């Protein structure tokens, strides 16, 4: 779809969506986002130009269907997939990609750390119609045999350009965690829980030098500008437990991310900001407000947040609660959490469970925000339920397969798709049926009092 769009711009000196938006040009990608969101093309252009909406769309990902992340758009969700050094299979990552798209992921991050990382990534991009993001430090470390002491700025930039050429649409880079922040980490209950953040800490402590992503930020911007890779500024110091939420370390990094946002915008590079983490419910709104203030309203992209630390095996639920509140208060994209969080590498089944939990959270937030049309599907479901239209109910459900499966466990015969009851109440105790009888009597003139 995008090949002709990209081809006609090939002689432009800058080809980022932010550059075009600032020049007053509405690109085909902006038109596509406006159509999907039900918003005007000019609104999309102006939001991109202000930096409040990003369209992650690497010029080399030609099969990508453009989507927008920002407060003006519906709340988006990201699904994390990826191999590890203990479990690596390209076919499994392709399956996770397809499952993610089937159940509604708006973007996918390939967080692979084991196996043939380039082959996995290229396969994921090839099979994906949604933007693919990465955390480049994982491959950077992989390519230097897992020893952070072998990392050089040249090796960093080589990996990032390679991934950009392959079609990665956004990079998470841990560039706001500085050498001077290290003493603040010592005060924490759980230290650093970000993989990328812990690697940067190891590098800085070994060499007593500044964060290389911060040092090479201008060179990174040049790569992003060339391929229109959106920067997702990572939160190395996100809280990994409730006790560390909103602490001095987290906020010190957030201030630096705000400064780097302005530097990226100067180069026409799109930016979103990553956020926590583990946050008590009563602190979520404050975190969102601080991010908007310190990071100039760049889209906020949060992991959860988890609102309790004791839900192991059910962290997709614990985090979806926080995610719904965060999105209601202005977060633009939610990074899903699966039931395996803190316990192991998720499989395709876990991916499905995580996505559905977050689809619910995102949709509930859009309703609470009063987004036009957000409740239409809910109202249609109410009509289908009251009319006992079972097949329509299955179609409208966020997970049609699960809805039909649960209904058919007790009443599998096709005749029950026309029944005026389900297995919960049976024909005699159905409240809908009784209510309809009451309304019918009232309509025929019978007194209800």
From Swiss-Prot:
Task: Identify the species of origin.
Answer: Wolinella succinogenes (strain ATCC 29543 / DSM 1740 / CCUG 13145 / JCM 31913 / LMG 7466 / NCTC 11488 / FDC 602W) (Vibrio succinogenes)
**Protein name as it appears in the record:** Phosphomethylpyrimidine synthase
Q: Give the matching NCBIfam families.
A: PRK09284.1, PRK13352.1, thiC
In its UniProt record, a GO molecular function of this protein is:
carbon-carbon lyase activity
Q: What protein family is recorded?
A: Belongs to the ThiC family.
- Co-factor requirement: [4Fe-4S] cluster
Q: Which GO terms describe its cellular component?
A: cytosol
Pathway(s) per entry: Cofactor biosynthesis; thiamine diphosphate biosynthesis
